[in-house]
Amino acid sequence: MSSLANKAKSKGKSSKSKSNVNTQVDELSDSIGLVVRVMTAVVDIKFDGGKVPKILNALESKKFYNGKKLVLEVSQHISDNIVRCIALDSTDGLSRNDEFIDTRAPISVPVGRGTLGRVFDVLGNTIDDCGPLEESKYIIKPIYSEIPKLTDQKIATEILVTGIKVIDLLAPYLKGGKVGLFGGAGVGKTVLIMELIHNIAKAHRGVSVFAGVGERTREGNDLYHEMIESGVINLNEKDQSQAVLVYGQMNEPPGARLRVALSALTMAEYFRDSENQDVLFFVDNIFRFTQSGSEISALLGRIPSAVGYQPTLAAEMGAMQERITSTNNGSITSVQAIYVPADDLTDPAPATSFAHLDSTTVLSRQISELGIYPAVDPLDSTSQALSADIVGEEHYEVAKEVQRILQTYKSLQDIIAILGMDELSEDDKLIVARARKIQRFLSQPFHVAEVFTGSPGKFVSLEDTVSSFKGLVEGKYDHLPEAAFYMVGSIDDVIKKAELLQKEGKV
């Protein structure tokens, strides 16, 4: 793919050649409607035959706009023969009395092995300039499906090892669980997601489905090329690829941004239910899903609720989140980047997401300002998996001791700022020294950031992580300099770095 900047061009090609919207209906008079009103992303269509389309049906234009057909989704019945629809692409060029056909089916997308290594838009059209899909390797499924029955769901108690120390030790992820990455702008949510995709594809050989919801086109392009370079996507043998990308980017209408997560989730559900796989489902960014819903809600004329969000916020979030679960066939482990407006966790958008999560990874601006990456807050991040029953007694005790030391250091910082280190007791001085080493040891070089940092990425096993921090809290490494703990992998790397610093006379 040359660039996702050419997306519109390739979308046009794929739409003309093969559309995934079911248009195989007789063009009877009662299935054709006329545009009577256009309000940017919301369009009113009149059906004179008296038979209006069902809610969530897709309507497709009879003519092309900017090289492709326009698809609308029915959202409201506002009279006996008029429906209000959400546009899933730009309405530029649309005018009154233009004709639309009721497809008599919801939006549908391709699913199956043929989707691996490809990039799609919300309608399931390929946008990567790699040609059409192989027809024998995919089927078409609607983006709306039932939530798995309670009897089919499985309780998740197995840890998903990410290779990232701060996560595996203090806020471990459950296989089949839902994880929220919380953070303001520019603290590293997308980089952390890219590293998780890289590590899990390499360590677990699992399929990842990535939903780009309302984020930058440049980031989507970077992620695609990073996956090619790391081998997650194999351009020569698509079947060997381990990821599917579905994008509804920042420049697209709110309808596309609202539905793209469901398109990607439908692809993930196929791998779980039909191929019995453990799937990783990444969403970047779940806040944009909420934001696009708010835009659509205002255009549809609904009365807003708190802070201007849509009154259906909790229902829309629940309808998507409840489909992300483990079943007897396989699991979907979801990692969702959640932008926090003005770093306010009480904002309704991130607050609504909290109820659905098993783990929260909070990215802190204060930690990123210290130059510690990933900038995960070890005290604010939580996980239901951090219990002795799931992670084991040793891991649990080490994690709690690390948190105790860091919490004590945090409570001493005001005293240090006012009176200085000399006024602390010897015990407190020791805790501060260990806490500063722990803080730096929680940093880690990432594989996906090698081109920026020049440092090779590190994948640290869970056993190494627990044993390294156990030695640290027990005081086995009190003699090593603080600088040796910064941006390394395991404790063996710390010892090597300490020896190097000593040779160079920097300690």
UniProtKB/Swiss-Prot annotation:
Q: Which Gene3D superfamilies match?
A: 2.40.10.170, Bovine Mitochondrial F1-atpase, Atp Synthase Beta Chain, Chain D, domain 3 (1.10.1140.10), P-loop containing nucleotide triphosphate hydrolases (3.40.50.300)
Instruction: List UniProt keywords, sorted A-Z.
Output: ATP synthesis, ATP-binding, Cell inner membrane, Cell membrane, CF(1), Hydrogen ion transport, Ion transport, Membrane, Nucleotide-binding, Translocase, Transport
Give binding positions for ATP: G183, G184, A185, G186, V187, G188, K189, T190
A Pfam family found in this protein is ATP-synt_VA_C
Q: Classify the protein's membrane topology as the record does.
A: Peripheral membrane protein
Tree of life domain: Bacteria
The EC designation for this entry is 7.1.2.2
Q: Name one GO molecular function term.
A: ATP binding
Which cellular compartments is it found in? Cell inner membrane
Q: What are the start and end residues of every segment in region (Disordered)? A: 1-22
Q: Which InterPro entries match?
A: AAA+_ATPase (IPR003593), ATP-synt_VA_C (IPR055190), ATP_synth_F1_bsu (IPR005722), ATPase_a/bsu_AS (IPR020003), ATPase_alpha/beta_chains (IPR050053), ATPase_F1/V1/A1_a/bsu_N (IPR004100), ATPase_F1/V1/A1_a/bsu_N_sf (IPR036121), ATPase_F1/V1/A1_a/bsu_nucl-bd (IPR000194)
Major subcellular location class: membrane
- Catalyses which reaction? ATP + H2O + 4 H(+)(in) = ADP + phosphate + 5 H(+)(out)
Spell out the GO cellular component terms annotated for this protein, sorted alphabetically and separated by semicolons.
plasma membrane; proton-transporting ATP synthase complex
Q: How does it assemble?
A: F-type ATPases have 2 components, CF(1) - the catalytic core - and CF(0) - the membrane proton channel. CF(1) has five subunits: alpha(3), beta(3), gamma(1), delta(1), epsilon(1). CF(0) has three main subunits: a(1), b(2) and c(9-12). The alpha and beta chains form an alternating ring which encloses part of the gamma chain. CF(1) is attached to CF(0) by a central stalk formed by the gamma and epsilon chains, while a peripheral stalk is formed by the delta and b chains.
Q: Which HAMAP family match?
A: ATP_synth_beta_bact (MF_01347)
Task of the protein: Produces ATP from ADP in the presence of a proton gradient across the membrane. The catalytic sites are hosted primarily by the beta subunits.
PANTHER family for this protein: ATP SYNTHASE, ATP SYNTHASE SUBUNIT BETA, MITOCHONDRIAL
What family does the database annotate? Belongs to the ATPase alpha/beta chains family.
Q: What is this protein called?
A: ATP synthase subunit beta
Source organism phylogeny: Bacteria, Pseudomonadati, Pseudomonadota, Alphaproteobacteria, Rickettsiales
The gene coding this protein = atpD
